[in-house]
Design a protein with these regions (language model features):
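Core catalytic lobe of class I
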Residues: 1-224
Length: 224
C-alpha cells in the first residue's frame, strides 16, 4: 500500500483498521507465489456444501444461483462489493495435457440467459444500496450479461479491459488476449468510490501459467 504513493486517507478505513492492514503487509512474505495452487488430489478435501472460515473471511463450495447457498455464505450480512467470474458459455478447453474444461460452460442461449438472471438476481438480493460490482464476461455474450445485470437492478457504468500477457489458443481468426469486465452498481443509488481520479479502464495483469492451475481461465490474485 505504501509503495503505491497514494493518500491512504482516501481508503475510508479507520486508523486502527488501516494500521492492522499495514502491519500484515509488513509481515514476512509467504513461501509461494500468490497465484500458485497445489496439485489437485484424486479425492478432494472440500466437497459441495462445505463452508470454510478463514479468519474474517468465509468461503463456500456452493452455487451462486441457489439462494440458500448465498444466504448461508453471507450469514445475514449485506455486501458492499461483488466480484463475479461466472462461466462465459464459450465451451473453453484448456491446452494443457489435462485438456481442462469448465463446468457449465456450454449451455443453449435460453439456458444461459436463465442462468445469468438467477445469478445476478442472487447478487442483488444481498447487495447494499449503491453496492458496486465487477463482472467478468465474454465478448460473444456481452449483451446477455448486461441485460441480466440491468434486469436484476444493477446499472452498468463502464467496461474495463484486462489486457493479458499471452493470448488464449483457439481456432478463431483472432486470438483473444483480453477479457472484458463490467463495472456496475445497484441502480438508483450513488456508488461509493474509494479510488483516486487516475484509474483507467485498461488493466495490465499477468496471466498465471495455465499448467499450474485447475481452472484454465483462472484470474490472477491481483484482480481480486
Amino acid at each position: 500500500m505504501r509503495d503505491a504513493d497514494n493518500d491512504l486517507g482516501l481508503i475510508g478505513l479507520e486508523d486502527e483498521e488501516l494500521a492492522r492492514l499495514l502491519a500484515q503487509q509488513d509481515a514476512a512474505e509467504g513461501l509461494t507465489d500468490g497465484d500458485a495452487v497445489p496439485k489437485l488430489q484424486e479425492t478432494p478435501i472440500s466437497v459441495l456444501g462445505d463452508l470454510w472460515l478463514l479468519g474474517e473471511h468465509r468461503l463456500l463450495c456452493g452455487d451462486a444461483t441457489v439462494r440458500a447457498d448465498v444466504e448461508r455464505l453471507i450469514a445475514g450480512e449485506a455486501i458492499d462489493l461483488i466480484l463475479t467470474d461466472l462461466p462465459h458459455n464459450v465451451d473453453y478447453e484448456g491446452y494443457t495435457e489435462d485438456r481442462l474444461k469448465i463446468r457449465g460452460d456450454r449451455m443453449t442461449a435460453e439456458q444461459f440467459q436463465q442462468f445469468l438472471r438467477e445469478a445476478f438476481g442472487s447478487y442483488r438480493r444481498i447487495a447494499k444500496p449503491g453496492a458496486s460490482m465487477y463482472a467478468c464476461h465474454s465478448s460473444p455474450w456481452q449483451r446477455q450479461f448486461q441485460d441480466a445485470m440491468e434486469s436484476a437492478g444493477f446499472e452498468v457504468r463502464c467496461q474495463i479491459i484486462r489486457a493479458k500477457n499471452t493470448f488464449a489458443w483457439g481456432f478463431g481468426r483472432y486470438k483473444f488476449r483480453h477479457e472484458p469486465i463490467f463495472y456496475a452498481h445497484v441502480g438508483g443509488q450513488k456508488d461509493p468510490w474509494y479510488g483516486d481520479k487516475s484509474q483507467s479502464t485498461l488493466w495490465h495483469e499477468k496471466k498465471p501459467a495455465a499448467n499450474r492451475i485447475a481452472d484454465p481461465l483462472f484470474q490472477p490474485v491481483l484482480i481480486h
